[in-house]
Amino acid sequence: MGLSDGEWQLVLNVWGKVEADIPGHGQEVLIRLFKGHPETLEKFDKFKHLKSEDEMKASEDLKKHGATVLTALGGILKKKGQHEAQLKPLAQSHATKHKIPVKYLEFISEVIIQVLQSKHPGDFGADAQGAMGKALELFRNDIAAKYKELGFQG
């Protein structure tokens, strides 16, 4: 299920656009995630009180957390599948501390693709979307395997 060099290049090309505005992209990803899948908001004590999109947009903490999420994901994507060292602590915290189900990682993966489609239509055509989908699936599968090792049934 690995990606070809060409597919990784497509992923990293569009990720360069994300890195030009990590906080903005991260904020939009989290807002779309919380609006589309309100149950995910329950995992974030810091954001549970944010009920409207306007409140979410005004939250500096939400923007910062979105940047943290996408910065971590970018570090993983840049490893082109050789992400064991980056993945282990992430899986550990998401399994044992945050208890984030794999399903929620599927939700955020879908949202990331939607945000990239809306913000970068010229740089995120069908081939790039397919490549990003594969990269995010690889990430999720590897997280799920780590969850299993940790005894988390997420």
Curated annotation (Swiss-Prot):
Phosphoserine: residues carrying this PTM: 4
EC class of the enzyme, as a word: oxidoreductase
Domain named Globin: residues: 2-148
Catalytic activity: Fe(III)-heme b-[protein] + nitric oxide + H2O = Fe(II)-heme b-[protein] + nitrite + 2 H(+); H2O2 + AH2 = A + 2 H2O
Family annotation (InterPro entries): Globin, Globin-like_sf, Myoglobin
Protein location: Cytoplasm, Sarcoplasm
CDD domains with a match to the protein in the record: Mb
Positions annotated to bind nitrite: 65
Residues holding heme b: 94
GO cellular component assignments: extracellular exosome; sarcoplasm
GO molecular function terms attached to this record: heme binding; metal ion binding; nitrite reductase activity; oxygen binding; oxygen carrier activity; peroxidase activity
Residues with PTM Phosphothreonine: 68
UniProt entry tagged with the keyword Nucleotidyltransferase: no
Gene3D superfamilies: 6.10.140.2100, 6.10.140.2110
Binding site for O2: 65
EC number(s) recorded for this UniProt protein: 1.7.-.-, 1.11.1.-
Pfam families per the UniProt record, alphabetical: Globin
Transmembrane segments: none
This protein's UniProt keywords: Cytoplasm, Heme, Iron, Metal-binding, Muscle protein, Oxidoreductase, Oxygen transport, Phosphoprotein, Transport
GO BP, sorted A to Z: removal of superoxide radicals
UniProt KW DNA-binding keyword: no
Role noted for this protein: Monomeric heme protein which primary function is to store oxygen and facilitate its diffusion within muscle tissues. Reversibly binds oxygen through a pentacoordinated heme iron and enables its timely and efficient release as needed during periods of heightened demand. Depending on the oxidative conditions of tissues and cells, and in addition to its ability to bind oxygen, it also has a nitrite reductase activity whereby it regulates the production of bioactive nitric oxide.
Recorded family membership: Belongs to the globin family.
Subunit structure as annotated in this protein's UniProt entry: Monomeric.
Protein name per its UniProtKB record: Myoglobin
Protein source organism: Rousettus aegyptiacus
Gene that specifies this protein: MB
